[in-house]
Amino acid sequence: MTGLLRALRIWRSVLTLLLLLWWDAQSWTYPGGANAELREQRQRQRAHWLTAELLRLGSAFIKLGQLLSARPDILPAGWVAELAALQDSVPAFGFAEVQTVLEQELGQRCAEVIDLDPEPLGAASLAQVHRASLRSGRQVVLKVQRPGLDRLFRLDLDVMQQVAAVLQRHPSWGRGRDWPAMARECRRVLLRELDFRVEAQYAARFRQQFLDDDRIRIPGVVWELSSRRVLCLDYLPGIKINDREALIEAGINPSAVAEIGAASYLKQLVRFGFFHADLTPAIWPSPPTEPSST
């Protein structure tokens, strides 16, 4: 898809959203008159539409939706709850594309990877994760970036900045907000996330902070199999910390997990000044066989 066609597709979605919001603000569009219940119903419909539209637009907009789902100061609660579904709704890309990216990034080093599972453990807006074994016997996961993401991201982020400028000039939606600043910050963060070498450095630093705490396990980086678009980490299975039933069934005390998690965050903030900013439950699994660990 050319840059112009991509921009037109994005603007079509933006203008449709603006038209829907304008329509919903008009009392005469509600049969029998507007009331709180009808307005809330419309909001849920629009939030559902927006979530589906962001999924159709792809990675950069899925990531934007995920960021907005953590901003109740910008969007109503109903919108935030609907957008939160983007955390788990991203479709995977094909295994052949996974293999192509690995070959492009790792070259002959791919020979070290055996038993690469074609089914991803999970898929996200930027990448998906596959379990594998190395020739050494080490169990790992490979985070593989979606193909063609760099060019697409830059196109999308350029349009996002244009949209932000339009929103800022709106008499209602621009009041009390700095949309261009949010677009610039979004651009800075997302472009940095495209380089998995940065994430690898952060992961290694984060692991170093907790080497003296045997209650907390953080996967090590396999540097020789990591690159700009591939990140190789030790495989550490676990249970989502918000899956209370599964924790109890495994003999793990959820309260103990919560206490360890809270203590680790205090240590990150107060002692190290370097902390993990993603509180998604899937990011913080509890090991399935160690009731005192997280």
What is each PLM-predicted segment?
Residues 126, 138, 228-229:
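Residues on conserved beta-strands of the protein kinase catalytic domain
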Residues 282-286:
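Hydrophobic residue at the +6 position relative to the catalytic HRD Asp in the kinase catalytic loop
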Residues 131, 138-146:
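Glycine-rich ATP phosphate-binding loop
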Residues 132-133, 279:
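Conserved beta3 strand of the Hanks-type protein kinase catalytic N-lobe
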Residues 77, 84-91, 103, 150-155, ...:
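ATP-dependent phospho-/nucleotidyl transfer catalytic cores
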Residues 136-138, 291:
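Short acidic/polar mixed-charge low-complexity motifs
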Residues 1-128, 151-179:
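N-terminal accessory/targeting segments that precede structured cores
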